[in-house]
Amino acid sequence: MNVTVSMLDSVGAAGLVLWAVAMWAAVGVLAYANRGRVRPWVYQLSVGVIGLGVVGQFGHVQEHVAQVAYWIAHPNDKAWMTPLGTGLANGLGQVAPDKPSLGMEILHLTGNFIFLAGLVGVVLITRRALSTKARKWGRMGVLMQGIHGVEHLVLTLSVALGASQAIGLSTWFGLLEPGPGLWTYRIWWHFLANVVGSVIFAIAVYHLWCERRQVAAGYHRDVPRPRAPEPAAAAEHTPVPADPGAR
């Protein structure tokens, strides 16, 4: 099937991929820089990564909400995508025009990795505040979204490698025949995964806001304090009182 791809679709698709790559490059820098001495810029960059993750997931989850809304009205129809999602999928699908569903798989894979990077940002920024609730919820989100991300990676690779349909948990590993049963199962599987993940992310960000002073305090450079004299050194400089009986 020939699909006309506009310049806007191509630019949007390239921009989305660059967005994800930039976020993961930042995550790598943060993970390395946060291991040693305190670097205040790590805090600011982590906030930026989290913010981009929030924006990305806000758009991503809306696509799934729209799909479910369409399914409610047309439960026997093939999964629907918004015009924006369709355009981005068409742009991404140019990497392999002979695989019509690959663009859609890459789109959701990219969206999920943007989401995952935002959650990793929460874990990184709280590395010096281990007892915070934000860190607990952030780690929970990374675990769940990590599994979800692997699912999308498997779905994408299966299509890219020539499978007749995507293979993964959300397709019963390719055992479900294309039709209303498969479409319904996959639509709701990914909708619930994204909604639950988004709620966890929202709770993590909420606690991060409430605990922001505690988290930020870990990135303040300590002012060096004068060292207390060693006991032996102090004894050497202590004057010995004169013996009153000595002449």
Predicted regions and their residues:
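Hydrophobic alpha-helical segments at protein termini of multi-pass membrane proteins
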Residues: 1-239
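Solvent-exposed, extramembrane regions of membrane proteins
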Residues: 241-243
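A positional/structural detector of protein chain ends, strongest at the extreme C-terminus
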Residues: 246-247
